[in-house]
Amino acid sequence: MKLMIFTGLVLFAIVSLIEAQAENEKPCLPEYKVCTHVPGNCCSDLVCDCYGRYKSGAQIGRNCFCLQKGVIYKREN
């Protein structure tokens, strides 16, 4: 009986450890994906770049996207 309880606890610990590792290894976000709420999840060659949205001079929100490092984006008219 004690052996069964011990085995069950060991199996539970192993499954919990595997699930915790899987959560830490979430896939990275590819280019142009939204990263507003997860700024550290962009793939290694990308950076989470944020832009404010304004209406009548007041900020109404913020958008963040995974973009290439060192690239400057400009608005076209």
Curated annotation (Swiss-Prot):
InterPro entries: Spider_toxin_CSTX_knottin. One of its GO terms (molecular function) is toxin activity. Residues 1-20 form the signal peptide. Contains 4 disulfide bonds. Keywords: Disulfide bond, Secreted, Signal, Toxin. It is found in: Secreted. Expressed by the venom gland. Residues 21-26 form a propeptide. One of its GO terms (cellular component) is extracellular region. Belongs to the neurotoxin 19 (CSTX) family. 08 (U8-Lctx) subfamily. This is U8-lycotoxin-Ls1p. The lineage of its organism: Eukaryota, Metazoa, Ecdysozoa, Arthropoda, Chelicerata.
